[in-house]
């Protein structure tokens, strides 16, 4: 009789399992592959990616935004999906650092894989990383600056943060122009971090330089035929209602009539209902009617005769924003005018942007609403420009709420790396190896930035490391000249909250993947045909 029983299968035949080192290696390989995919987009001289839809080859995206790249590609590896999730979370939380968080997590796992091969237990690595994280976070906090009490200096900080964010985007050639634009837009919010008050519209034609900030709300629709094209101090009613009351047409019914006279009576009755609804709307005392749905010729004519500006087919996002900035409410019934909140502004007028007519609402009551009008040669340029502007707006909104800033250009990473190295020097045992690996992963950020710019990264990073160990806490990478410079003088400033979020999220993702020692792929549940 055999002294050892054969393993008993407990999984369904369609399920699969990876255990121990194989599972861990699979996780490492997937995460590192994702890191290698996006790391070439990092930094002011990062490269772009072209994403082509599998279902529609004509649909393509040109971008270097980490979150956009990762969310648009199909990924099967579970560890890689975790990095995609943290990149998406980074984008939702602070708007920037989506590539950095993925790269840092991947570099931590690359170092972790090397330690595992040297027989360092994953729990030892995790313990060392936790100690390193606390030290790095403390070093980052000690390097912060806060100029919120000085409006001039704080605005300059915001401009530098915007320039830093835009320097790696398609807008880098006009980063000063766009930095001023987004800073003005965010400061108009007066401390409010709700970016719904800032509307972005894209109009093909012209160049990126021709983009501008309009101090009002622009709706990409046309005013009804025969209606007033300009109104001062208007009363605005915003609705989401069907102007057609023809229930036969709406519900697809059929009616049999004996004569054309009866058919004419039915049409007259429907027109009467429609005009009654128009009368109720006009009785609100308004002179501007904005509807999400269609306004037919008959109601449009009625509104024109009564001096009411009618705007139809306003998209839902547009009327939500318009209601927010004008102080109105979106209504669908008109029986109780006294309960309806009417919006207002100083001026409504039809203006031209390029070859298109749009409607501008100026003198918004809150004074916060504004519109960024983007111009560009192609739709691909405009889409990428919008993503870049969105990232910059999010970072600035975060900075207005959390006013502390840190230096960029690899300076913050080197400050944290130096502190972590000092911790490793006084830590006994294999845990010191894990702490050292954390410092190496942090140094990979400036290394990759230098590599992407075409410089000798080994030389530059060693010079940067030496400068910090000699006490120069403001030393950073000068990517314009390929040398070491003063990050503060270079104006490379980043939000403390963004940098801290990158550090914490990357560590959490790397630790989660490091803990994995088993990957189970369950079989799909079989659905049997039930007979009744």
From Swiss-Prot:
One of its GO terms (biological process) is protein folding. It is found in: Cytoplasm. Gene3D superfamilies: GroEL (3.50.7.10), GroEL-like equatorial domain (1.10.560.10), TCP-1-like chaperonin intermediate domain (3.30.260.10). GO terms for molecular function: ATP binding; ATP hydrolysis activity; ATP-dependent protein folding chaperone; unfolded protein binding. One of its GO terms (cellular component) is phagocytic vesicle. The keyword DNA damage does not apply. InterPro entries: Chap_CCT_beta, Chaperone_TCP-1, Chaperonin_TCP-1_CS, Cpn60/GroEL/TCP-1, GroEL-like_apical_dom_sf, GROEL-like_equatorial_sf, TCP-1-like_intermed_sf, TCP-1_chaperonin. Disulfide bonds: none annotated. Keywords: ATP-binding, Chaperone, Cytoplasm, Nucleotide-binding. Pfam families: Cpn60_TCP1 (PF00118). Heterooligomeric complex of about 850 to 900 kDa that forms two stacked rings, 12 to 16 nm in diameter. Belongs to the TCP-1 chaperonin family. Molecular chaperone; assists the folding of proteins upon ATP hydrolysis. Known to play a role, in vitro, in the folding of actin and tubulin. This is T-complex protein 1 subunit beta.
């Amino acid at each position: 009789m055999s002294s050892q029983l054969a393993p008993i299968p407990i999984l369904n035949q369609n399920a699969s399992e990876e255990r121990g080192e194989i599972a861990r290696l699979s996780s490492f390989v997937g995460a590192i592959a994702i890191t290698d995919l996006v790391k070439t987009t990092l930094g002011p001289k990062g490269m772009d990616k072209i994403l082509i839809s599998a279902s529609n080859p004509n649909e393509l995206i040109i971008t270097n935004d980490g979150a956009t790249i990762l969310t648009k590609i199909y990924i099967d590896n579970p560890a890689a999906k975790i990095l995609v999730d943290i990149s998406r979370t980074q984008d939702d939380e602070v708007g920037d650092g989506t590539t950095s968080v993925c790269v840092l997590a991947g570099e931590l796992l690359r170092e972790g894989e090397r330690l595992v091969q040297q027989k360092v237990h994953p729990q030892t690595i995790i313990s060392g990383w936790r100690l390193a994280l606390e030290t790095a976070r403390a070093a980052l906090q000690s390097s912060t600056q806060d100029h919120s009490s000085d409006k001039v200096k704080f605005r300059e900080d915001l401009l530098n943060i915007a320039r830093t964010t835009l320097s790696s985007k398609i807008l880098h050639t006009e980063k000063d122009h766009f930095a001023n634009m987004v800073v003005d837009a965010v400061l108009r919010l007066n401390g409010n971090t709700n970016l719904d008050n800032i509307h972005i519209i894209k109009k093909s034609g012209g160049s990126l330089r021709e983009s501008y900030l309009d101090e009002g709300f622009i709706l990409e629709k046309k005013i009804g035929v025969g209606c007033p094209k300009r109104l001062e101090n208007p009363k605005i009613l915003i609705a989401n209602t069907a102007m057609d009351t023809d229930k036969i047409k709406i519900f697809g019914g059929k009616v049999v009539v004996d004569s054309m006279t009866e058919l004419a009576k039915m049409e007259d009755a429907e027109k009467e209902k429609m005009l009654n609804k128009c009368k109720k709307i006009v009785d609100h005392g308004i002179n501007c009617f904005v509807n999400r749905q269609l306004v037919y010729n008959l109601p449009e004519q009625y509104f024109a005769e009564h001096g009411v500006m009618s705007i139809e087919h306003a998209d839902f996002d547009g009327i939500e924003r318009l209601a927010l900035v004008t102080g109105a409410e979106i209504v669908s019934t008109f029986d109780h005018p006294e309960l309806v909140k009417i919006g207002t502004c100083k001026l409504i007028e039809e203006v031209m942007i390029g070859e298109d007519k749009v409607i501008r609402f100026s003198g918004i009551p809150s004074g916060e609403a504004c519109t960024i009008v983007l111009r560009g040669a192609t739709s691909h340029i405009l889409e990428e420009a919008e993503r870049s502007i969105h990232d910059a707006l999010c970072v600035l909104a975060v900075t207005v709420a959390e006013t502390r800033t840190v230096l960029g250009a690899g300076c913050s990473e080197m400050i944290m790396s130096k502190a972590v190295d000092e911790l490793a020097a006084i830590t006994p045992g294999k845990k010191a190896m894990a702490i050292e690996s954390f410092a190496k992963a942090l140094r990979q950020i400036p290394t990759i930035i230098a590599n992407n710019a075409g410089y000798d990264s080994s030389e530059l990073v060693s010079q940067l490391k030496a400068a910090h160990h000699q006490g120069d806490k403001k030393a950073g990478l000068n990517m314009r000249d390929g040398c070491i410079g003063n990050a503060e003088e270079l104006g490379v400033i980043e939000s403390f909250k963004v940098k801290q979020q990158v550090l914490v999220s990357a560590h959490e993702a790397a630790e989660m993947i490091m803990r994995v020692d088993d990957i189970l792929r369950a079989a799909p549940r079989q659905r049997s045909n039930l007979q009744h």
